[in-house]
C-alpha cells in the first residue's frame, strides 16, 4: 500500500507546471464552473488537457479503460474517497474526460442504439457535457453490468458509502431526480462532479444543484459590489 504522502507526491509531480499557471477551475474561492445545455465548455482542448492525469496514476483504481483521464485534483480526491470507503475493489471508473469528438461519437451512437428520448435524458449535447472539463467522473459497481452510458451505482455497499461521503472529498451527485427541471438531465446516480469540499458541503447541506448554486454565488458577488462573476465560459 502506498502512503498518502507518496500518492500526493505523484500528483504533485504532474502538477509542477500547474503551479506556474494557477487553475481557477477548482480553487475554493472561485465559483465552480457550470457546464450545461445553456453553458457550453469553451476552453481549448490543449488547455484542458494540460490539467489531466490518467487514472492509471493510481495503480489500484479500477477503470474500464486505463487511458481514462481526470483533472489532477479531481483524480487525487477520487483516489482518497475510494480509499476512505473501501471502494477500490467494488467501484470502477467508467468514464472521465471526453473531448468534443468523443462526446459527439457517444451522442450519435446513443441516438442510433437507444433512440432520441433516452439520449436526451442521459447524454449531454456535444460541447455541453461536464465530461469536457475533466472534473466529472462516472463510476459503476464492479458487480453491475458497467453499461457505458448508465452504469449501475446502487445505494448500498461501497457505492452507498461513496455517495454518503462524496461531499467530504469535494464531489456532488450532479444530476438528481428532483432537480431535473433545472439540469435538463435525468437522475444519474453514477455521475459525480468535483467542485471542491467547501462548495460541496454547502450544496449538500442546502440541497442545491450546480445551476442554483452558481446563481446564488453570482448574486452574492454582485451584492458585494464585485460586479458580474465569471464562471469560465
Ligand atoms: Zn457522466
Identify the residue ranges that each predicted region occupies:
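Extracytoplasmic cell-surface/polysaccharide-interacting catalytic and binding patches
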Residues: 1-96, 100-233
Amino acid at each position: 500500500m502506498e502512503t498518502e504522502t507518496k500518492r500526493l507526491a505523484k500528483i504533485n509531480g504532474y502538477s509542477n507546471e500547474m503551479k506556474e499557471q494557477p487553475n481557477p477551475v477548482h480553487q475554493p474561492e472561485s465559483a465552480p464552473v457550470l457546464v450545461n445545455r445553456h453553458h457550453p465548455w469553451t476552453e481549448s482542448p490543449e488547455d484542458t488537457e494540460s490539467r489531466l492525469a490518467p487514472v492509471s496514476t493510481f495503480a489500484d483504481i479500477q477503470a474500464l479503460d486505463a487511458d481514462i483521464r481526470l483533472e489532477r485534483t479531481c483524480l487525487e480526491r477520487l483516489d482518497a474517497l475510494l480509499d476512505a470507503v473501501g471502494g477500490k475493489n467494488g467501484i470502477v471508473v467508467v468514464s472521465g474526460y471526453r473531448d468534443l469528438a468523443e462526446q459527439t461519437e457517444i451522442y450519435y451512437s446513443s441516438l442510433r442504439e437507444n433512440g432520441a428520448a433516452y439520449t436526451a435524458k442521459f447524454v449531454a449535447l456535444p460541447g455541453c457535457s461536464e465530461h469536457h472539463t475533466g472534473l466529472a467522473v462516472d463510476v459503476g459497481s464492479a458487480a453491475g453490468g458497467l453499461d457505458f452510458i448508465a452504469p449501475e451505482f446502487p445505494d448500498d455497499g461501497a457505492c452507498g458509502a461513496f455517495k454518503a461521503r462524496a461531499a467530504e472529498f469535494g464531489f456532488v451527485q450532479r444530476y438528481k431526480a428532483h432537480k431535473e427541471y433545472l439540469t435538463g438531465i435525468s437522475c444519474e446516480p453514477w455521475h459525480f462532479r468535483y467542485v471542491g469540499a467547501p462548495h460541496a458541503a454547502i450544496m449538500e447541506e442546502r440541497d442545491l444543484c450546480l445551476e442554483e448554486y452558481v446563481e446564488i454565488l453570482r448574486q452574492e458577488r454582485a451584492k458585494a459590489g464585485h460586479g458580474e462573476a465569471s464562471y469560465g465560459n
